[in-house]
Amino acid sequence: MDLGDNELTLTPIPGKSGKAYMGSYPDGKRIFVKMNTSPILPGLAREQIAPQLLWSRRLADGRDMCAQEWLTGKILTPYDMNRKQIVNILTRLHRSRPLMTQLSRLGYAMETPVDLLQSWQETAPDALRKNHFISEVMADLRQTIPGFREDHATIVHGDVRHSNWIETDSGLIYLVDWDSVRLTDRMFDVAHMLCHYISEHQWKEWLTYYGYKYNQTVLSKLYWYGQLSYLSQISKYYMNQDLENVNREIHGLRHFRDKYGKRR
C-alpha cells in the first residue's frame, strides 16, 4: 500500500484487523501507522502510557491516519504480566482526569455494569449469544450486578491482554491498541489482569499496591468483572476467527467460575 506521500510505503501488520501498518521511507526510517484510532493518543503519549504520536491526517477517503514512533522491542508474554511497571501504568491511566475529561468531550458516555452487559449482548456474534454456557453466565451476571458510582468512574483501556503491551529495548513498557477505550469502573481492566495473569496468592499484594482495599466487596466485584473480561475476549477472538483462543478463554471462564463462584 503506497500513499504516494513523502514516498511512505505501508505494509499491513498481521493480526491487527487490517488497520495497522508498518510505514517505511526510502532512507530506512520506520513508523507505526494506524487507521481510525483513538483521538486521545496525544494525551496518552504525554502521560507516557502510549508511544509518541508523530502526526495525524485525514485521507481522501475520509479515514484518519495516525503515525507513532516505531518501537524496537518485544510484545509481552503472559509470564511478563506481573511486573510493577504494568500496575503503575494502569494506575496512571485510571487516575488521569485530563484523559477522562477528553473522552467525555469526545462524546463517550459513562457505562454502568448494566450498560456493559447490554453492549456485549448487542455486539457479540449470534453463535455466542445462543451458546448455552454463555447464556448461563450472562444470566448470572444480570442477577449479581455490582455497585457503581459515576463519580468513581475512570478511563479504562478495555483490552489489557498481554499482546497489547510492548517493552522497548530500553526497558520502557507501553500499552497499545486503544480501540476498546471507555469510561466505566476501573475494575474492568483490573479484573482482566488478575483473572488472566496473576496467581491468586498474589491478588492481595497486587490490589493493595494498586490502591484497592482487600475485602469481600472488592473480591465480589473482581469475580463479576472477571467473568465479563472472559466474555469480552471470547467475542473478540471469535470475530477474528481465532477459535483456538476462543476455546482457551471458554475453558478459562469455566475454571474461573468453578473456582471462585462459591466465594461471592
Curated annotation (Swiss-Prot):
Changing residue 159 to A: No effect on growth. A motif (APH) lies at residues 173-196. The active site is at 159 (proton acceptor). One of its GO terms (biological process) is DNA replication initiation. It catalyses: D-ribose + ATP = D-ribose 5-phosphate + ADP + H(+); 2-deoxy-D-ribose + ATP = 2-deoxy-D-ribose 5-phosphate + ADP + H(+). It is found in: Cytoplasm. One of its GO terms (molecular function) is ATP binding. GO terms for cellular component: cell division site; cytoplasm. Its EC number is 2.7.1.15, 2.7.1.229. It is an enzyme of class 2 (transferase). It comes from the Bacteria. A motif (Brenner's motif [HXDhX3N]) lies at residues 157-164. InterPro entries: Aminoglycoside_PTrfase, CcrZ_PhaseVar_Mediator, Kinase-like_dom_sf. The keyword Cell division applies. Disulfide bonds: none annotated. NCBIfam families: CellCycRegCcrZ. Belongs to the aminoglycoside phosphotransferase family. PANTHER family: CELL CYCLE REGULATOR CCRZ, PHOSPHOTRANSFERASE YTMP-RELATED. Plays a role in cell cycle regulation and chromosome integrity. Activates DnaA-dependent chromosomal DNA replication initiation ensuring that the chromosome is replicated at the right time during the cell cycle. May regulate replication initiation through phosphorylation of a possible second messenger or metabolite, and by interacting with replication initiation proteins. Has ATPase activity with D-ribose and 2-deoxy-D-ribose in vitro, but not with choline. Involved in DNA damage response. This is Cell cycle regulator CcrZ. The lineage of its organism: Bacteria, Bacillati, Bacillota, Bacilli, Lactobacillales. The gene is ccrZ.
